[in-house]
A protein has these predicted regions:
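Intrinsically disordered, low-complexity acidic Ser/Thr-rich regulatory segments
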Residues: 1-67, 130-136
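Short loop/turn motifs enriched for small/polar and acidic residues
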Residues: 38, 81, 127
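Forkhead-associated
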Residues: 46-121
Length: 136
């Protein structure tokens, strides 16, 4: 007589499945995407997001670690999805995420706009390298 657990199976999932995967070439090779800390405890730090993908902003952890006590452990996510497809997403943070002074849940962001998390002010910078112009 079969045991009562014969119908149950265990499946082990690959730990890497939940991690965001970065796609090569998602941002044009001649474009650089950065986030600069403009105010707060980490003022002056710059993070390169040019590879594209998703970056977690968090207190002392994550892809963009900040030493701001008002920033949640997993506060927000910056998504670089392609040319001019940049988003900021609040990750159910305690103190909220603000884009240009307005509280947001998920919002597209442009170069030069300001993102506030806790007491830290971040600015997204998109630099497109100029190409030489042929002489006429």
């Amino acid at each position: 007589m079969p045991g009562r657990n014969d119908h149950m199976t265990t499946t082990r999932l690959d730990e890497n499945l939940h991690r965001p995967r970065l796609k090569e070439g998602i941002v044009p090779a001649d474009t650089r995407v950065y986030v600069r800390v403009m105010a707060g405890p980490d003022k002056g730090k710059v993070f390169d997001l040019s590879r594209g993908g998703s970056y977690v902003v968090g207190r002392r952890k994550g892809d963009i670690p900040l030493s701001d006590d008002k920033v949640s452990n997993r506060h927000a996510e910056l998504k670089i999805l392609g040319p001019e497809a940049y988003f900021v997403v609040d990750l159910a943070s305690t103190n909220g995420t603000f884009l240009n002074g307005r509280r947001i849940d998920r919002q597209q962001v442009q170069g030069g706009e300001e993102i506030r998390v806790g007491d830290s002010l971040l600015q997204l910078s998109v630099i497109e390298q100029s190409r030489p112009v042929s002489k006429a």
